[in-house]
Amino acid sequence: EVSGEHKNKIVPQIEGTKKALSFVKKYPDRFGMLIRCRPRFEKNIQELDTFISKHREFIYGLKFHPYTSQLKITDPRNYPYFYLAKKYNLPILVHTANDKYSKLIYMDRVCKKFNDLTFIAAHCELLSDHLITIEVLKNNPNLYCDTAWVDMKFIKLLKANDLMDRIMFG
């Protein structure tokens, strides 16, 4: 079975999160962290809830990578994590790309269903012309995007569409 995860040994979520936290705690004035959620591979919502509660000041959001998890963001297995984000007022960053798991149109659906949460579409649908981003941003006030792997021409197009307040640079 294809797991969707990298072939290298994957560190369990809580173990990896603890390692990241130890680094962030050394430089709390310079770093915060996002917790990567992998609901297809790990069922640890209670443990994660306890961890966030204990270390909330260092945790800036949750992160999903649909392609490597081979799980669309619209999949109900993600929902317990969304409720956790709501509980702790955390944004949810989702890697988006032009593949069968990561399309920005899935963000449109989840932003509408969970309109009380804040979502960030990383890469504005990588490996595409990014144009769907404009429509999805306009339709969802709870959605932001970042500029990682996005060319300057598209950023200018976002500006022309009066969407600069919805961009995270980086």
Enumerate the predicted regions with their spans.
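Catalytic pocket-lining loop regions of alpha/beta-barrel enzymes
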Residues: T74-G170
